[in-house]
Amino acid sequence: MDHSHHMGMSYMDSNSTMQPSHHHPTTSASHSHGGGDSSMMMMPMTFYFGFKNVELLFSGLVINTAGEMAGAFVAVFLLAMFYEGLKIARESLLRKSQVSIRYNSMPVPGPNGTILMETHKTVGQQMLSFPHLLQTVLHIIQVVISYFLMLIFMTYNGYLCIAVAAGAGTGYFLFSWKKAVVVDITEHCH
C-alpha cells in the first residue's frame, strides 16, 4: 500500500535528491492532517554524501555547493571542538570556585569501646553566587550546542557527521589531556 500521500511526504529512491513534495488537496484523493504549510522535506534515514539541498539546522540555511559544504564542515568542526573545550572549562571553573571549605567532626566508635572523632571536609557554594550563575549560563550554552550537534548529525549527511566526530575528537585531544578519566553521567551529547 502506498502511503506517500500522507503528510505531504514523498518517498525517494537511492538516486533521488531531496526535493519538497507539494500536496494539493484539490488534486489528490488524500486527506489533510492539520493546518500550516503542507509541503515538507523528506529526511533521509541513511547516511549519504552530497551537498545539494542540505538544510543545516534552519530552513533558510541550505547548502547547495561544494564550497558551502566545505564552509559548513569547518563551522561544524569548530562548534564540536568548542563544545569539548566548554566542558573542560566548566570543570576547571567549578574546581576554582569551590573555595568555601567546612570541616565537620563527628564521633565514631573506635577499638575497645573508645570514641574517635572523624573529620569530613565539605565543599560548598551559594546558590546566588557569581560562580554558580556563571556555571548556569555556561550549562545552558553547553546544552544548546549539544542539541545543535545532535541535530546536525541527524541530517545523516556524511560530511557533516564526520565534522561533528572529528571536531569532538580534536577538541577532546586538545582540551582533555590534563583531565582525569572519569565517566561523566551528566554528558548530554554522547
UniProtKB/Swiss-Prot annotation:
Its main location: membrane. It is found in: Cell membrane; Early endosome membrane; Recycling endosome membrane; Apical cell membrane. Residues 83-132, 178-190 are cytoplasmic. Changing residue 189 to S: Markedly decreases the copper(1+) transport activity. Residues 1-61, 154-156 are extracellular. The modification Phosphothreonine is found at residue 114. GO terms for biological process: angiogenesis; copper ion import; copper ion transport; establishment of localization in cell; intracellular copper ion homeostasis; plasma membrane copper ion transport; protein complex oligomerization; silver ion transmembrane transport. Pfam families: Ctr (PF04145). Changing residue 161 to S: Markedly decreases the copper(1+) transport activity. GO terms for molecular function: copper ion binding; copper ion transmembrane transporter activity; identical protein binding; silver ion transmembrane transporter activity; xenobiotic transmembrane transporter activity. Changing residue 5 to A: Affects copper(2+) binding. Increases the efficiency of the reduction. Changing residue 95 to H: In NSCT; uncertain significance; does not affect localization at the plasma membrane. A motif (Methionine segments (Mets) motif) lies at residues 7-12. The modification Cysteine sulfenic acid (-SOH) is found at residue 189. Copper(1+) transport is stimulated by extracellular acidic pH and high potassium ions concentrations. Copper(1+) import is regulated by a copper(1+)-dependent recycling of SLC31A1. O-Glycosylation at Thr-27 protects from proteolytic cleavage in the N-terminal extracellular domain. PANTHER family: HIGH AFFINITY COPPER UPTAKE PROTEIN 1, SOLUTE CARRIER FAMILY 31 COPPER TRANSPORTERS. The C-terminal domain mediates copper(1+) binding and is involved in the copper(1+)-dependent-ATOX1 interaction. The C-terminal domain appears to act to limit transport through the pore by regulating the rate of exit of copper ions at the intracellular side. The N-terminal domain can collect copper(2+) from copper(2+) carriers in blood. The N-terminal domain, in the trimeric arrangement, tunes its reactivity with copper, promoting copper(2+) reduction and copper(1+) stabilization thanks to the presence of histidine (His) and methionine (Met) motifs. It is linked to Neurodegeneration and seizures due to copper transport defect: An autosomal recessive disorder of copper metabolism characterized by global developmental delay, seizures, cortical and cerebellar atrophy, and axial hypotonia. Death in infancy may occur. Belongs to the copper transporter (Ctr) (TC 1.A.56) family. SLC31A subfamily. This is High affinity copper uptake protein 1. The lineage of its organism: Eukaryota, Metazoa, Chordata, Craniata, Vertebrata. The gene is SLC31A1.
